[in-house]
Amino acid sequence: MTHNHDPYSDAKELAGLTLGKATDYQAEYDASLLQGVPRSLNRNAINLTAESLPFHGADIWTAYELSWLNAKGKPMVAIADIQLSHESQNLIESKSFKLYLNSFNQTKFDNIDAVQKTLVQDLGECAQGQVTVKIIEPKSFGIQRVVELPGTCIDDLDIEVSDYDFNPDYLENSTDDKQIVAETLNSNLLKSNCLITSQPDWGSVMIRYQGPKIDREKLLRYLISFRQHNEFHEQCVERIFVDLKHYCHCTKLTVYARYTRRGGLDINPYRSDFEHPGESHRLARQ
């Protein structure tokens, strides 16, 4: 269970981030612009250790504003799909990622493979973990799809809400042990706030589980309770996963959130104890 105490207020690892500060934009390649945040900051607070994580998965990023110069100086553009392993020591702070990608804008690369290899090397070094990068060229833009999350949307439930403070206790006594089900639910009402700037982060979340049937109204109240909660996207998804395992006793569980983009980047954390992410397709709000 993950009650809302603040593990971040004294975290020296956050003090040096460019996030929330005035920033000069560099247009020439500089890998040092990337900044990582230790995953342990959040995981310690929800009683997780790197040696015994209850899930696997990835932080799935889409970079829509990737541009560089080819060997002749002509601008090139692409989209990048990036997957960062859940086992990496650090998550990548998104503003630093944006600044890093901007540094490609006036930098010459011999070919697209050189761009891909540079991204893999730099992101892996910052995150201290495994990274995969797929670069999508303009000739393939037309096949990029907009999809809906799988499952049954719970947002039309007619509930009255007056409390918007994060509270995992909404999941207390939320299951029916006499009904063992396998189902997929989703909501577009996920909103949290940036840990540093408190800017709103808008997202949709899919929950696929097997186990005692979860009361959908209680689940929706729980998700709505993130509305004024300050935490990075990746941390929110891991918190949801841990809370559902604790309160709802899911025997199998996947939590997959897709957040709207900011600065040309969207972040889509995926955590599961029984399946792996498939192709990454954006939602309408992304």
Curated annotation (Swiss-Prot):
Record family assignment: Belongs to the GTP cyclohydrolase I family. QueF type 2 subfamily.
Pathway note: tRNA modification; tRNA-queuosine biosynthesis
Biological role: Catalyzes the NADPH-dependent reduction of 7-cyano-7-deazaguanine (preQ0) to 7-aminomethyl-7-deazaguanine (preQ1).
Record: active site: 194 (thioimide intermediate), 201 (proton donor)
Lineage: Bacteria, Pseudomonadati, Pseudomonadota, Gammaproteobacteria, Alteromonadales
UniProt keyword list: Cytoplasm, NADP, Oxidoreductase, Queuosine biosynthesis
BP GO terms, sorted: queuosine biosynthetic process; tRNA modification
Pfam families listed in its UniProt record: QueF (PF14489), QueF_N (PF14819)
Reaction catalyzed: 7-aminomethyl-7-carbaguanine + 2 NADP(+) = 7-cyano-7-deazaguanine + 2 NADPH + 3 H(+)
Keyword Cytoplasm among UniProt keywords: yes
Cellular component annotations (GO), alphabetically ordered: cytoplasm
Name of the protein this chain belongs to: NADPH-dependent 7-cyano-7-deazaguanine reductase
Assembly with partners or alone: Homodimer.
Primary site of residence: cytoplasm
Location in or out of the cell: Cytoplasm
Record organism: Shewanella sp. (strain MR-7)
Residues annotated to bind NADPH: 94-95, 262-263
InterPro entries tied to this protein: GTP-CH-I_C/QueF (IPR043133), NADPH_dep_7-cyano-7-deazaG_red (IPR050084), QueF (IPR029500), QueF_N (IPR029139), QueF_type2 (IPR016428)
The enzyme's E.C. designation: 1.7.1.13
Keyword Oxidoreductase annotated: yes
One MF annotation (Gene Ontology) recorded for this entry: preQ1 synthase activity
